[in-house]
């Protein structure tokens, strides 16, 4: 009899409580879990949830799609947000669609978008 067969025979003689203690001891010693594997049907749902979490963006670009009817107000807001001069801000607004701010946090992007929308602009977050 090989050592593996002997070990299997000895484990087979353990009570349920002893077997449970053995599993816990092995989990601790080797840093593993004896949790059952997920069945095939459950695996399809799990990666979809993980993919959605992984795809959640942390940085956004604020894009000015159109200036709208109140172009002067939009130019003022673009100047305040970007720090551009009057001429550069006017060129940006006239050349819409243009990216006003790149790689900003979600909160900041929403704040900028609200300011631009309040001024009459059409805005998109990418």
Swiss-Prot record:
Family statement drawn from the similarity comment of this UniProt entry: Belongs to the bacterial ribosomal protein bL12 family.
Gene3D superfamilies, per database record: 3.30.1390.10, Single helix bin
GO BP annotations listed: translation
Subunit structure: Homodimer. Part of the ribosomal stalk of the 50S ribosomal subunit. Forms a multimeric L10(L12)X complex, where L10 forms an elongated spine to which 2 to 4 L12 dimers bind in a sequential fashion. Binds GTP-bound translation factors.
The encoding gene: rplL
Any Pfam family: Ribosomal_L12_N
InterPro entries referenced in this protein's UniProt entry, alphabetically: Ribosomal_bL12, Ribosomal_bL12_C, Ribosomal_bL12_C/ClpS-like, Ribosomal_bL12_oligo, Ribosomal_bL12_oligo_N_sf
Species whose genome carries this gene: Chlorobaculum parvum (strain DSM 263 / NCIMB 8327)
UniProt-recorded name of the protein: Large ribosomal subunit protein bL12
GO molecular function: mRNA binding; structural constituent of ribosome
Keyword annotations from UniProtKB, A to Z: Ribonucleoprotein, Ribosomal protein
């Amino acid at each position: 009899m090989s050592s593996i067969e002997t070990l299997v025979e000895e484990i087979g003689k353990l009570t349920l409580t002893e077997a449970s203690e053995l599993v816990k001891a092995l989990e601790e010693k080797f840093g593993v879990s004896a949790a059952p594997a997920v069945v095939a049907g459950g695996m399809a749902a799990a990666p979809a949830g993980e993919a959605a979490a992984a795809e959640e963006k942390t940085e956004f670009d604020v894009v000015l799609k159109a200036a709208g009817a109140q172009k002067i107000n939009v130019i003022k807001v673009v100047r305040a947000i970007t720090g551009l001069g009057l001429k550069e801000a006017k060129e940006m607004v006239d050349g819409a669609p243009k990216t006003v701010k790149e790689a900003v946090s979600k909160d900041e992007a929403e704040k900028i978008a609200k300011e631009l929308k309040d001024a009459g602009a059409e805005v998109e977050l990418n």
